[in-house]
């Protein structure tokens, strides 16, 4: 994918996008990939090298990554931050990176997923957010 800078944002932002360290590890698919449209995923795979995206389209994701890095400061025996979990289902390896797991007791875990977004995003239901948390819960239960 080619990254553009149509609005002349600082070059450091472009490098942050280009040097993204995200990986789904050895998984066939990530939780976010699994809950996304299969048609969009297929088209993205097919046309990835000819796709174009602007730096400005990635700013929310950068802010989310920054929040995740800061959240790691809160890690303790009770709080597990930024852990990537893996599970197998029907021969597929699935992975998900959980922002925060709060260990309530030996058998109970609260899962939190931070969202850095605009107010418009919370004005309607986001079933994909619920689906994401349900997949994370499945990964936690199957460890």
Feature-to-residue mapping (PLM):
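An active-site-proximal "capping" alpha-helix that borders the catalytic cofactor pocket
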Residues: 129-141
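Metal-dependent nuclease catalytic cores that hydrolyze phosphodiester bonds in DNA/RNA
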Residues: 1-111, 118-131
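Hydrophobic/aromatic-lined pockets within catalytic cores
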Residues: 116-119, 138-142
């Amino acid at each position: 994918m080619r990254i553009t800078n149509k609005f002349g944002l600082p070059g450091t932002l472009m490098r942050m996008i280009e040097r993204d360290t995200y990986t789904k590890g050895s998984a066939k698919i990530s939780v976010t990939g699994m809950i996304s449209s299969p048609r969009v995923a297929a088209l993205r795979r097919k046309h990835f090298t000819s796709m174009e995206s602007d730096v400005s389209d990635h700013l929310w994701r950068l802010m989310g990554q920054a929040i995740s890095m800061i959240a790691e400061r809160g890690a303790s025996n009770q709080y597990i931050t930024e852990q990537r979990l893996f599970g197998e289902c029907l021969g597929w390896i699935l992975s998900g990176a959980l922002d925060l797991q709060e260990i309530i007791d030996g058998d109970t875990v609260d899962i939190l997923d931070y969202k850095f977004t605009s107010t418009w995003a919370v004005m309607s239901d986001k079933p994909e957010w619920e689906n994401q948390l349900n997949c994370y819960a499945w990964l936690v239960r199957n460890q």
